[in-house]
Amino acid sequence: MTDQIAQNSARPAWETSDHIDDQVVNELRQKFGPDAFTFQPTRTGMPVVWVKREQLIEVMQYLKSLPKPYVMLYDLHGVDERVRTHRQGLPAADFSVFYHLISLDRNKDIMLKVALSEKDLNLPTLTSIFPNSNWYEREVWDMFGIVFNGHPNLRRIMMLPNWEGHPLRKDYPARATEFDPYVLTKQKEDLEMESLTFKPEEWGMKRGTENEDFMFLNLGPNHPSSHGAFRIILQLDGEEIVNCVPDVGYHHRGAEKMGERQSWHSYIPYTDRIEYLGGCVNEMPYVLAVEKLAGIEVPERVKVIRVMLSELFRINSHLLYISTFIQDVGAMTPVFFAFTDRQKVYDIVEAITGFRMHPAWFRIGGVAHDLPKGWERLLREFLDWMPKRLDSYVKAALQNSILKGRTIGVASYNAKEALDWGVTGAGLRATGVEFDVRKWRPYSGYENFEFEIPVASNGDCYDRVMLKVEELRQSLRILEQCYKNMPAGPFKADHPLTTPPPKERTLQHIETMINHFLQVSWGPVMPANESFQMVEATKGINSYYLTSDGSTMSYRTRIRTPSFAHLQQIPAVIRGSLVSDLIVYLGSIDFVMSDVDR
């Protein structure tokens, strides 16, 4: 792993490359021929390979069967290519679908793309190779109208069942003012409610057997244990779960569509709200991806400040997760303790950024302003306070015999199952896979920090919560190093696309002042290219895949969140368990619906 990290860091993150020297490219050429593919130079940091639709299944099977296989379908989505101007050298396409695969043995990624004509929008499903492609293919159909032949149940997932149109197409309106006035008649309301009625036959479920009928129970979308606007339809035989269907989309806001109508700079506040507990952690992949497009290298002080804010929000999120998990099992007191501790985190965040939950504080090329006087004292007080409090959570609640009895051995899965379903974060590390982006693919200077990656082996509810406790301790270690080793220097990069540019120079240089005016009013113009950045977020791996067409706005903003993949796995894990086990399992996943629905 160390050699691979060194290899990855040798090439500048913003360098445009087709990666034809990558080992997997040679393997593909040897198998399918030297002229079988088109290689696209990008700033994604991985080979981007256009394949023919007829070859897609064979190529996928080959990549998954290599000696060092690509075991995870990390992401799958689409792009409306019809009005894109900068696509020289690429196959003709009205639409394209991309498949992002990860190989843990190589610590490498590859992206496959398929070009499609508007008159022939169909592809073969990958559900027999990667089971987690199910929801991703449903979302691509929902957003673009691309059909996946052989899909077990191709239907809408984000929008209402009777929704008209496909929102991520370029000819679909992006603003409410572009629609006719909305009128909800009684007849329409009845139709909307009827469309949400669950029909077991549509999902391959039986209503009963010769001897007994099954009960179908709605858990949510308004239920304290569903952790948000989330509905699960349960097929029950008494208390035993025969099968279930997660129903998401109630919290969908069109975050990716908004990215096409906001400037690169003005989209930053939206990133905070993708996973509304993560704060600056959510800003990190976006600004890093934009900086790759711009070719910006930020100062060391900026890197450490960003790490410090990210780890503060990681602690904040983990505290809420641990305490609400304990509450789901039946204990109330730890929640109130946790909110006391989280208040201390928010006090530090507010002192530094001016805001609490959603600071929108990272900037393209730096941060909004320098650290204030006295930040060291606040951080020092928190570092002295938190370790003992963490010990009390473990002693008072997590070592409780009742909690252990409810969680040990419950909702367990192994590493292969986790990888098949695209699980990342603590859910993957609980199965023994030591994959943490901060260590394996360091960003923002994480390679300069000393910390461990906690892992477990049972993959059950108890392992997942205890891993979060250990991750909290490691975050405190990182914060201690930020406190002791904060570099001096500027808080913004000296680069023309730093947004907004350093204010001081606008008073001395007319060109800088004009540049400042244009970037604040219209937004910076990013070079036409594609970039990608993943980070170890609070709930797993979060990433942004950005496409620039040489404009002040993104041509396509793809947001891959961990919770979407984690909820898709629920039926495979919980079948055969009790309803009470489902409640504990939901509490152990660590999700919020804004992260799922975007």
Curated annotation (Swiss-Prot):
Stated family: In the N-terminal section; belongs to the complex I 30 kDa subunit family. In the C-terminal section; belongs to the complex I 49 kDa subunit family.
Main location: membrane
Recorded topology in the membrane: Peripheral membrane protein
The protein's assembly and partners: NDH-1 is composed of 13 different subunits. Subunits NuoB, CD, E, F, and G constitute the peripheral sector of the complex.
InterPro entries with a match to the protein in the record: NADH_DH_suC, NADH_DH_suCD, NADH_Q_OxRdtase_suD, NADH_quin_OxRdtase_su_C/D-like, NADH_UbQ_OxRdtase_30kDa_su, NADH_UbQ_OxRdtase_49kDa_CS, NADH_UbQ_OxRdtase_CS, NDH1_su_D/H
HAMAP family: NDH1_NuoC (MF_01357), NDH1_NuoCD_1 (MF_01359), NDH1_NuoD (MF_01358)
Domain of life (superkingdom): Bacteria
Record-level GO cellular component terms: NADH dehydrogenase complex; plasma membrane
PROSITE patterns named in the record: COMPLEX1_30K (PS00542), COMPLEX1_49K (PS00535)
Ranges for region NADH dehydrogenase I subunit C: 1-189
Compartments (UniProt record): Cell inner membrane
Reactions accelerated catalytically: a quinone + NADH + 5 H(+)(in) = a quinol + NAD(+) + 4 H(+)(out)
GO molecular function, one term: NADH:ubiquinone reductase (non-electrogenic) activity
Its job: NDH-1 shuttles electrons from NADH, via FMN and iron-sulfur (Fe-S) centers, to quinones in the respiratory chain. The immediate electron acceptor for the enzyme in this species is believed to be ubiquinone. Couples the redox reaction to proton translocation (for every two electrons transferred, four hydrogen ions are translocated across the cytoplasmic membrane), and thus conserves the redox energy in a proton gradient.
Protein name per the record: NADH-quinone oxidoreductase subunit C/D
Gene3D superfamilies, alphabetized: Cytochrome-c3 Hydrogenase, chain B, NADH:ubiquinone oxidoreductase, 30kDa subunit
EC number(s) on file: 7.1.1.-
Protein biosynthesis recorded as keyword: no
Enzyme class label: translocase
Keyword line: Cell inner membrane, Cell membrane, Membrane, Multifunctional enzyme, NAD, Quinone, Translocase, Transport, Ubiquinone
Region NADH dehydrogenase I subunit D, residue ranges: 213-598
